[in-house]
Amino acid sequence: MSLRRIMVTAVRNLHPVTLLPSPRINILYGSNGSGKTSVLEAVHLLGLARSFRSTRLNPVIQYEQAACTVFGEVQLTEGGTSNLGVSRERQGEFTIRIDGQNARSAAQLAELLPLQLINPDSFRLLEGAPKIRRQFLDWGVFHVEPRFLPAWQRLQKALRQRNSWLRHGTLDPASQAAWDRELCLASAEIDEYRRNYIKALKPVFERTLSELVELDGLTLSYYRGWDKDRELQEVLASSLLRDQQMGHTQAGPQRADLRLRLAGNNAADILSRGQQKLVVCALRIAQGHLVSQARRGHCIYLVDDLPSELDDQHRRALCRLLEELRCQVFITCVDHELLREGWQTETPVALFHVEQGRITQTHDHRE
């Protein structure tokens, strides 16, 4: 799938605009602070109903405007189109529309418009808390395993019940045992989906990484959130007193993590920032390959400030891998000449100049 048309209104400093992007490569260039990243943010808002720059959406709404709106016409892989729209009012009301109907949740957007983000904060996937790596993992599982979302929802409900009981003691023993059983069943299902996903991801990641950088000995492993040699029911029983003292469940899928190690060390501790960026790029490109295999479609990649921290050799290697995915890519940079020549002649490339929030298409992929 790809975006055929994007309409943006009142997002940060951007002037109202309608974009007709290339189905493949789109380069947004201009000076720092011109609004390039805000275009990526608008697409991110359309696909996930949230910003990657702020946990709050009010700062995304343009000053003195009541609401921001993003509309997109999506070219579906199987043919036909779908119309998506998101609107956020300053007073807090959020509206998601899919083909003229109100959507039940942002998950419906994510399913229609799978997005991958690579930006200067991407190193947090390696350096940040386990929650960030779980989100990365679960994004991938969600897009290849349709049974994952209902299992994840059951897990969250069971966890809320158990944690409430741990803090307040509001459940009788029979009810508590029933919720523990539900938690264990959902946990086993989630763990199976995650293990299968990592098994499929690892060889694709290793192959992709080898085309970007030589890091012999880098390993990717999955920790499920409790002892691999014990059943979760046993772990929960043995840690019950400690869980009550802490007020929450300490073992389970909500504690899962991905571990990247190099020479026996946490990879984030010894890799340079440029190497970390390449590892994250390899992980996200590998996810794109799995989405393509499972859905017969493609991710859309948002790449903010691609040239930063990468020399010409690695920049070209990354462009080549993105091109081989045959997906739609939106890239920002200051100097478009660094990227303009990095593609095959038959690949449609569109150029957009961004200056003080105004976007001008300077090269049309259809020409």
From Swiss-Prot:
Question: What residues bind ATP, as annotated?
Answer: G30, S31, N32, G33, S34, G35, K36, T37
Q: Name one GO biological process term.
A: double-strand break repair
Cellular component terms per the entry's GO annotation: cytoplasm
Question: GO molecular function: any one?
Answer: single-stranded DNA binding
- Subcellular locations according to the entry: Cytoplasm
Q: Which InterPro entries did the record assign?
A: DNA-binding_RecF, DNA-binding_RecF_CS, P-loop_NTPase, RecF/RecN/SMC_N, RecF_2
Q: Does the keyword DNA damage apply?
A: yes
Instruction: Name the job this protein performs.
Output: The RecF protein is involved in DNA metabolism; it is required for DNA replication and normal SOS inducibility. RecF binds preferentially to single-stranded, linear DNA. It also seems to bind ATP.
Q: What is this protein called?
A: DNA replication and repair protein RecF
Q: Provide the species name.
A: Pseudomonas putida (strain ATCC 700007 / DSM 6899 / JCM 31910 / BCRC 17059 / LMG 24140 / F1)
